[in-house]
C-alpha cells in the first residue's frame, strides 16, 4: 500500500474548540499504527496557549510539512501559515482580527493538498459570522474550498457537493447553507442532477463502491402524495430520476422523507440525496451526534471536517470531545487510500 503523506488539520477559529480538539486528537492519533501523521496548520501561539491552559502536551513547530519531520516531534506538529494571531485569544470570545489567520490556515491546507504535500485536509470549525465581518465572501468552507480549487481538474463531475456521514448513513445536500425560503427556489432539475452525478462518481472513486445506490428524498409531505400535497415530485424529481437511471445511475424516485432514514430503509441505499440542509443533517446528527463527518465531494483534494461548530460556549473549559474530528481524520485517510 502507498505510504500516505501527512493529513493536515486547519486551526479553525482560535477562540473556539478547534485548537483543543486538534491537540486531543493528536494524542490519540499518534498512538495508532499504519496511519499518516497529523499536522496542524495555523499559529502555534494559539495551540500553545490552549495546551498550557488545559494541561495538554505542548505543540512543536514543524519546519517542513513532511512525514519524516512530523514523526520526529514529541508534540503536535504545527506548520506556520505565514499569518499570526493579531489579537489575544479569549476562549469563547471570537475576534475578527484573527480571521486572517483562520483563512490563511485553510488556504495553506489547500495549497499543500494540491501540491501533494499532504494527503488530505481536515478543517476545524470556523465562525461564519466572524469571517463575514472580516470580509469573507463565501457562505462557508465548502464554497471557499471550491473557489481555491477552481482551476484544477477533477477526476469526474466537478463539485462542490456536501456529504454528511454518520451512524451508517450518508446524505448529500442539493442546497447547503441557504435560508429555507431561498433553498426552495434553488431546488432545480440542474442542481439535483449535478448533485446526483457528483455523488455517484464520488461513491465509486472515494468509497470504492462499484455500483452505488442512491435514494432521492422528496420535498413535500409524503413525497407529494401523487400531487395532492405538491407537484415538485411529479414535475421535477421523478422525471429527473428516470433520466438518471437511463444514464446508468441507480437512483430511486422521490421518497417520503419521513420514512427514508429508519434502519430498514437505510439498508437499501449507499447515499441519500437530500434537498435542503436540515433534511439531511437532522437524521445524521440524530444517529451519530458526536461522530458525524462532513465530506466535500467533487474536489481535486480530499477534504473532511467534524460535523459540529466552534462551540464557543464550552471553549477553554477542557470538556470538548475530539470524537468527530477523529472520525473526520479516519474518513479522510480512507478516501486518500482509495485515490492512491
Curated annotation (Swiss-Prot):
<dbReference type="InterPro" id="IPR037510">
    <property type="entry name" value="PdxA"/>
</dbReference>
<keyword id="KW-0560">Oxidoreductase</keyword>
<feature type="binding site">
    <location>
        <position position="294"/>
    </location>
    <ligand>
        <name>substrate</name>
    </ligand>
</feature>
<dbReference type="GO" id="GO:0000287">
    <property type="term" value="F:magnesium ion binding"/>
</dbReference>
<keyword id="KW-0520">NAD</keyword>
<keyword id="KW-0170">Cobalt</keyword>
<dbReference type="GO" id="GO:0008270">
    <property type="term" value="F:zinc ion binding"/>
</dbReference>
<dbReference type="GO" id="GO:0005737">
    <property type="term" value="C:cytoplasm"/>
</dbReference>
<keyword id="KW-0521">NADP</keyword>
<dbReference type="GO" id="GO:0051287">
    <property type="term" value="F:NAD binding"/>
</dbReference>
<keyword id="KW-0862">Zinc</keyword>
<feature type="binding site">
    <location>
        <position position="141"/>
    </location>
    <ligand>
        <name>substrate</name>
    </ligand>
</feature>
<comment type="subunit">
    <text>Homodimer.</text>
</comment>
<dbReference type="GO" id="GO:0008615">
    <property type="term" value="P:pyridoxine biosynthetic process"/>
</dbReference>
<dbReference type="GO" id="GO:0050897">
    <property type="term" value="F:cobalt ion binding"/>
</dbReference>
<feature type="binding site">
    <location>
        <position position="177"/>
    </location>
    <ligand>
        <name>a divalent metal cation</name>
    </ligand>
</feature>
<dbReference type="GO" id="GO:0042823">
    <property type="term" value="P:pyridoxal phosphate biosynthetic process"/>
</dbReference>
<keyword id="KW-0460">Magnesium</keyword>
<feature type="binding site">
    <location>
        <position position="285"/>
    </location>
    <ligand>
        <name>substrate</name>
    </ligand>
</feature>
<feature type="binding site">
    <location>
        <position position="303"/>
    </location>
    <ligand>
        <name>substrate</name>
    </ligand>
</feature>
<protein>
    <recommendedName>
        <fullName>4-hydroxythreonine-4-phosphate dehydrogenase</fullName>
        <ecNumber>1.1.1.262</ecNumber>
    </recommendedName>
</protein>
<dbReference type="GO" id="GO:0050570">
    <property type="term" value="F:4-hydroxythreonine-4-phosphate dehydrogenase activity"/>
</dbReference>
<keyword id="KW-0664">Pyridoxine biosynthesis</keyword>
<feature type="binding site">
    <location>
        <position position="277"/>
    </location>
    <ligand>
        <name>a divalent metal cation</name>
    </ligand>
</feature>
<comment type="pathway">
    <text>Cofactor biosynthesis; pyridoxine 5'-phosphate biosynthesis; pyridoxine 5'-phosphate from D-erythrose 4-phosphate: step 4/5.</text>
</comment>
<keyword id="KW-0479">Metal-binding</keyword>
<feature type="binding site">
    <location>
        <position position="142"/>
    </location>
    <ligand>
        <name>substrate</name>
    </ligand>
</feature>
<comment type="similarity">
    <text>Belongs to the PdxA family.</text>
</comment>
<dbReference type="InterPro" id="IPR005255">
    <property type="entry name" value="PdxA_fam"/>
</dbReference>
<dbReference type="Pfam" id="PF04166">
    <property type="entry name" value="PdxA"/>
</dbReference>
<keyword id="KW-0963">Cytoplasm</keyword>
<comment type="function">
    <text>Catalyzes the NAD(P)-dependent oxidation of 4-(phosphooxy)-L-threonine (HTP) into 2-amino-3-oxo-4-(phosphooxy)butyric acid which spontaneously decarboxylates to form 3-amino-2-oxopropyl phosphate (AHAP).</text>
</comment>
<feature type="binding site">
    <location>
        <position position="222"/>
    </location>
    <ligand>
        <name>a divalent metal cation</name>
    </ligand>
</feature>
Amino acid at each position: 500500500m502507498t505510504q500516505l503523506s501527512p493529513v493536515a488539520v486547519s486551526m479553525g477559529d482560535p477562540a473556539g474548540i478547534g485548537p483543543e480538539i486538534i491537540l486531543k486528537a493528536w494524542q490519540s492519533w499518534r498512538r495508532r499504527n499504519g496511519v499518516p501523521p497529523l499536522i496542524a496548520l495555523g499559529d502555534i501561539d494559539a495551540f500553545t496557549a490552549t495546551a498550557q491552559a488545559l494541561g495538554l502536551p505542548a505543540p512543536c513547530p514543524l519546519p517542513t510539512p513532511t512525514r519524516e519531520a512530523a514523526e520526529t516531534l514529541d508534540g503536535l506538529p504545527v506548520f506556520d501559515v505565514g499569518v499570526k494571531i493579531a489579537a489575544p485569544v479569549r476562549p469563547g470570545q471570537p475576534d475578527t482580527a484573527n480571521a486572517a489567520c483562520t483563512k490563511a490556515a485553510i488556504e495553506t491546507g489547500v495549497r499543500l493538498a494540491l501540491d501533494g504535500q499532504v494527503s488530505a485536509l481536515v478543517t476545524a470549525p470556523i465562525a461564519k459570522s466572524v469571517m463575514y465581518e472580516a470580509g469573507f465572501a463565501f457562505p462557508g468552507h465548502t464554497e471557499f474550498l471550491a473557489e481555491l480549487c477552481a482551476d484544477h481538474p477533477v477526476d469526474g463531475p466537478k463539485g462542490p457537493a456536501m456529504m454528511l456521514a454518520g451512524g451508517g448513513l450518508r446524505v448529500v445536500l442539493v442546497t447547503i447553507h441557504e435560508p429555507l425560503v431561498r433553498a426552495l427556489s434553488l431546488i432545480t432539475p440542474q442542481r439535483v442532477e449535478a448533485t446526483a452525478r457528483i455523488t455517484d462518481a464520488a461513491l465509486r472513486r472515494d468509497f470504492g463502491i462499484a455500483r452505488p445506490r442512491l435514494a432521492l428524498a422528496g420535498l413535500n409531505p409524503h413525497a407529494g402524495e401523487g400531487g395532492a400535497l405538491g407537484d415538485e415530485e411529479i414535475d421535477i424529481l421523478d422525471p429527473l430520476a428516470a433520466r438518471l437511471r437511463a444514464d446508468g445511475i441507480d437512483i430511486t424516485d422521490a421518497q417520503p422523507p419521513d420514512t427514508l432514514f429508519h434502519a430498514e430503509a437505510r439498508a437499501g441505499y449507499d447515499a441519500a440525496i437530500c434537498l435542503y440542509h436540515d433534511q439531511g443533517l437532522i437524521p445524521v446528527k440524530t444517529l451519530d451526534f458526536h461522530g458525524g463527518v462532513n465530506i466535500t465531494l467533487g474536489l481535486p483534494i480530499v477534504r473532511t471536517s467534524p460535523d459540529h461548530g466552534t462551540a464557543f460556549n464550552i471553549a477553554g473549559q477542557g470538556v470538548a470531545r475530539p470524537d468527530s474530528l477523529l472520525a473526520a481524520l479516519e474518513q479522510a485517510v480512507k478516501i486518500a487510500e482509495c485515490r492512491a
